[in-house]
From Swiss-Prot:
<dbReference type="InterPro" id="IPR000114">
    <property type="entry name" value="Ribosomal_uL16_bact-type"/>
</dbReference>
<dbReference type="GO" id="GO:0003735">
    <property type="term" value="F:structural constituent of ribosome"/>
</dbReference>
<keyword id="KW-0496">Mitochondrion</keyword>
<dbReference type="GO" id="GO:0019843">
    <property type="term" value="F:rRNA binding"/>
</dbReference>
<dbReference type="GO" id="GO:0032543">
    <property type="term" value="P:mitochondrial translation"/>
</dbReference>
<keyword id="KW-0689">Ribosomal protein</keyword>
<comment type="subunit">
    <text>Component of the mitochondrial large ribosomal subunit (mt-LSU). Mature N.crassa 74S mitochondrial ribosomes consist of a small (37S) and a large (54S) subunit. The 37S small subunit contains a 16S ribosomal RNA (16S mt-rRNA) and 32 different proteins. The 54S large subunit contains a 23S rRNA (23S mt-rRNA) and 42 different proteins.</text>
</comment>
<protein>
    <recommendedName>
        <fullName>Large ribosomal subunit protein uL16m</fullName>
    </recommendedName>
</protein>
<dbReference type="Pfam" id="PF00252">
    <property type="entry name" value="Ribosomal_L16"/>
</dbReference>
<comment type="function">
    <text>Component of the mitochondrial ribosome (mitoribosome), a dedicated translation machinery responsible for the synthesis of mitochondrial genome-encoded proteins, including at least some of the essential transmembrane subunits of the mitochondrial respiratory chain. The mitoribosomes are attached to the mitochondrial inner membrane and translation products are cotranslationally integrated into the membrane.</text>
</comment>
<dbReference type="InterPro" id="IPR047873">
    <property type="entry name" value="Ribosomal_uL16"/>
</dbReference>
<dbReference type="GO" id="GO:0005762">
    <property type="term" value="C:mitochondrial large ribosomal subunit"/>
</dbReference>
<dbReference type="InterPro" id="IPR036920">
    <property type="entry name" value="Ribosomal_uL16_sf"/>
</dbReference>
<comment type="similarity">
    <text>Belongs to the universal ribosomal protein uL16 family.</text>
</comment>
<dbReference type="InterPro" id="IPR020798">
    <property type="entry name" value="Ribosomal_uL16_CS"/>
</dbReference>
<keyword id="KW-0687">Ribonucleoprotein</keyword>
<dbReference type="InterPro" id="IPR016180">
    <property type="entry name" value="Ribosomal_uL16_dom"/>
</dbReference>
Length: 249
């Protein structure tokens, strides 16, 4: 039975013939392939110092808790004072409205900033907006504890904080909101933060120290001396009088 099946299969295979209708199809396919142009692969430029993958986890902090070593002691420091006439951080950049501190520079803790942010989100719940933070906590505060004698080191880590200069923007907001609603949200947030704050809009004049650059006032005008100088005639007469005076005997 097996021999008969193999012989029948062999005879069927030998009876196969190539059809003549395949010749024009093959010619047409060859002509089409000759017309088509091969698509060259697009070269991908990869920098030599960039890894295509990473086996390490991403270590990134937030605006309230940075990815810094807590065991490394930090100096207390002082907030930035723009003595050279800088207006950096005093105007609204990304949003339409902002919250600006106007009384005195100070250090604000991360807990206070988080409370102010939660207050704004609670007031604007259900609205379409975007909140921008213009400050970030990057200063570690170390406390040695109550009733501790002087010395024995700086102390252990307590919390994160940020140094805020006078007239610096802390929060900005942009969205489909009424101005009065945003004013109310910033008013509630200002009550949660230390100091006095004001509501500013995009396009308001910048501030140098505690002086607003408005009504044609410029930084060059602030650099001029406030004390009025003596007239040239008065200075020349004073010099001539001192030169002609007789020396004391």
């Amino acid at each position: 039975m097996k021999h008969n099946a193999s012989s029948a299969l062999l005879s069927a295979f030998q009876g196969l013939r190539i059809s003549s209708s395949a010749t024009p199809f093959r010619a047409a396919s060859l002509a089409t392939s000759a017309v088509r142009r091969p698509i060259a692969p697009t070269p991908v430029s990869v920098a030599s110092h960039v890894r295509l993958f990473s086996a390490t986890a991403i270590q990134a902090g937030s605006w309230l808790e940075p990815n810094l070593n807590r065991k490394k002691k930090m100096m207390k420091g002082r907030p930035r004072v723009p003595t050279g006439g800088s207006t950096k951080g005093t105007t609204v950049v990304w949003g339409d409205y902002g919250l600006r501190m106007r009384d005195h520079h100070r250090r604000i803790s991360a807990q206070q900033l988080k409370l102010a942010e939660d207050t704004i989100k609670q007031r604007l719940r259900g609205q379409k907006y975007r909140l921008y933070k213009r400050v970030a906590c990057n200063v570690g505060v170390y406390v040695s504890g109550n009733e501790m004698r002087m010395g024995k080191g700086k102390g252990s880590f307590d919390h994160w904080a940020t140094r805020v200069a006078v007239n610096q923007i802390i929060f900005e907001i942009r969205g489909q909101l009424h101005e009065q609603v945003i004013r109310d949200a910033f008013r509630l947030a200002g009550h949660k933060l230390p100091g006095l704050y004001e509501f500013v809009k995009k396009g308001d004049p910048p501030v140098v120290g505690i002086t607003k650059l408005e009504d044609g006032l410029t930084v060059e005008d602030l650099k001029n001396p406030r004390k009025k100088l003596l007239m040239p005639e008065i200075t020349q007469s004073a010099a001539s009088t001192s030169s002609t005076a007789a020396p004391p005997s």
